[in-house]
Each structure stands twice: as structure tokens, then as C-alpha cells.
Amino acid sequence: MMLPLLAVSAFASLGAAQTYTSCNPTNSLKTWSLSTDFTQGSSDGWTAISGNVTYGSNGAEFTINKRYDAPTLETNFYIFFGEVEVVMRAANGTGIVSSIVMESDDLDEIDWECTGTDTTQIQTNYFGKGNTTTYDRAIWETVSSPQDEFHTYKVVWTAAAITWYIDGTAVRTLEYADAVDGKNYPQTPMVVKLGIWAGGDPSNSEGTIEWAGGETDYDEVPFTMYVKSVNIINYNPAASYNYTDKTGSYTSIVASNSTTGSGIHSSNSVSVFAPSSSTSTFTSSRALIATASTYPASVQTSSSGVVSLSSSSASSSSAAASSTSGSASAVFTGAAVTNLPSFFFTVFFALAIALAF
């Protein structure tokens, strides 16, 4: 999407999503999935960050009634690799853009955008770390009458690839290596945004207006986008995600306080589960790589992992973790960490006695 920041803040929520973030990845989806049926009304998992969103038999209604309207919903949580499936009917109207946006605080972004006068296509796009040096990432995919019919738009996002689906059919795949060897690959925790905005507003640049299909005539309002439902799966549920450096790499992200049964797996398929009474963190040189083929049975990661569990109830994980091989630099169970001071005390005490004699 990646457009210049507009003068009106209402447009900024989606029209310039890359220029705005809340910088607070401490709220995350702590369960595997969240399903929202907007035909039943609003949901606690979402917040209207701009404008007024109403609800009816067609689900959430995002309506432009006048200039500067840009109603937008945003999730109250982040996901760190996963799936986002939206059942949407795009809005009609010249210059009107219906958007499904996944966006991170590090300015990574994965998009669907449908303009109001293009009755045969929808745009797929992505950005990494706010890089706008080129605008050659967008690909338009065929879809039938998106303004008149509901279609299911889905993104499956892993550390290896992003795949866009329309009505169950894969239409585009982006491999990690194909995004400047990962440099421009979206890979940090994201929120999901749904909304409508006027790309054809006369205050926008000529290029933006042309891309949106022409200048918007506000005498033709209302323009309404509908979303019936959203299904979100988080491959790495946690209480929070912490950036440990400024690289913007997924390998630098620490998922803290993973939920019970989240099942983070190492490359040799040894499971490490975080009990509900414990806290856990997981970091890896190739951390948190999830694949659609293995989810939800496991979230696959490669080797060189470091796992810490701060609870004696983690003993069931101790034996499994101790068998981890490959290039793993260290593996500590809760029991090992807890007993470490007494272990060193015993060793030094024995050494002192030996030296005394």
C-alpha cells in the first residue's frame, strides 16, 4: 500500500499504514486462533481506530458518508506468523479502496486492496521495514465482481513464505529469499486492520489518485465495504513479543510467557511445552519458523535454540529438552536453572575440602 502520510489523520490509518504504528507489541493473541462473526455484532478482539463501524446482516459495515471518512478496525493483539482469513465484499466508488492490512511496529506489511471501479482484480502487496524505494511489489490477482459478491481472502504467513489465497485457491507466493534475501520480507509481529479510504481524494498525489481509479466524487456517497467474518491463527501464541535488537529480523524476536500447550518444537522434533504455571521464553538463530503443513500439530523451528522454563513443573520437558542435539548452544530446564546455585556451592565446597587436605 505504502502511500505518503495524508494531511487528514482519518486517512492515515490505512491510506498510509506504513507511516503509523502504536509501537506496543505487548498484547498478543494468547490462544491458537480467534474467529469473529461480524454478522453477530462487534467483537472485543477489535477496536475502531478511526470512524464509525456499524453491524448488520452482512457483517461489519465500513461506510464513507462524507469526505475524510475512513472507518477502520484493528485487532487488540499481535500475531507472530500465522493465518488471516477475511470474508469481504469490497466497496463501489471511484477512488474508493477497500483494504485488509497486516502491519507490524517495524513497518512490515502484507496487504489486500481492492479499488471501487476494478471489477475483475484485487491487489496483493507487501513491504519490509518501511522500504519504499521501489513500488514493484504489487501484483493484481483475478477475482470476480469483488464489489458485488463476497469472497474469502486469506494469507498464510510463515518465516519461509507468504501465500495469498482467493476462495481457497493460492494465487501468489512470496519466498523469503525472493524479498532481497529476506531484507524486505515481512517477519515481525503484526496487527490486522480492516478499513475503507478514499485514495481518490483530491488532496492525494496524482499517482495515488490514478492508482485508486480516479478522483472520488463525494456526491455519490455512501460507499460501503462489508466484512462478514475473520479467522485468525497465531502460529506462536504468547503474552508478549520483545524486540531484542534493531535488526528487524524474526530471529531477534522473543516470544514471552507462551501459553499452555503451544508446542514449540525444535528441528529434531523434540517438544518443549510451557506449563501454565511457568513462564517461558524461546529464542533461536532461526527462531519460530511455522509451516502450514505442520500446523497445528507443531510449530517447526530449526536448531541453535535456547529454551528456559522457570518452574519445577517443567520436569516433564527436562528429559526431552536434554536430548536436543545439533547446534543447540544451551538448553536449561526449570529444575536445572533452579538448582544451579546449589550445584556450584557443592562443587566449590568439595574442592575446598580437597585442597585443605
Curated annotation (Swiss-Prot):
Matches recorded under InterPro entries: ConA-like_dom_sf, GH16, Glyco_hydro_16_CRH1_prd, Glycosyl_Hydrlase_16
Coiled coil residues, start to end: none
A GO term from the CC aspect: plasma membrane
Annotated signal sequence range: 1-17
Localization: Cell membrane; Secreted, Cell wall
EC assignment: 3.2.1.14, 2.4.-.-
Entry-listed glycosylation sites: 52, 92, 131, 242, 257
Keyword entries, A-Z: Cell membrane, Cell wall, Cell wall biogenesis/degradation, Glycoprotein, Glycosidase, Glycosyltransferase, GPI-anchor, Hydrolase, Lipoprotein, Membrane, Secreted, Signal, Transferase, Transmembrane, Transmembrane helix
Domain of life: Eukaryota
SUPFAM superfamilies per UniProt: Concanavalin A-like lectins/glucanases
Disruption-associated phenotype: Does not affect growth rate, germination or sporulation and displays only minor sensitivity to high concentrations of Congo Red, even when all crh family members are deleted.
Gene Ontology biological-process annotations: carbohydrate metabolic process; cell wall organization
Molecular function in Gene Ontology: hydrolase activity, hydrolyzing O-glycosyl compounds
Catalyzed reaction equations: Random endo-hydrolysis of N-acetyl-beta-D-glucosaminide (1->4)-beta-linkages in chitin and chitodextrins
Major site of localization recorded for this protein: membrane
Parts of the chain that traverse the membrane: 337-357
Membrane topology qualifier: Lipid-anchor; GPI-anchor
Residue ranges occupied by any GH16 domain in the UniProt entry: 20-220
Matching PROSITE patterns: GH16_2
Covalently attached lipid (GPI-anchor amidated glycine), positions: 326
Function: Dual chitinase/transglycosylase that plays a role in cell wall architecture. Chitinase and transglycosylase activities are coupled. Required for the polysaccharide cross-linking at the septa and the cell wall. More specifically, transfers chitin to 1,6-beta-glucan in the cell wall.
Name of the protein in question: Crh-like protein 1
Record gene name: crh1
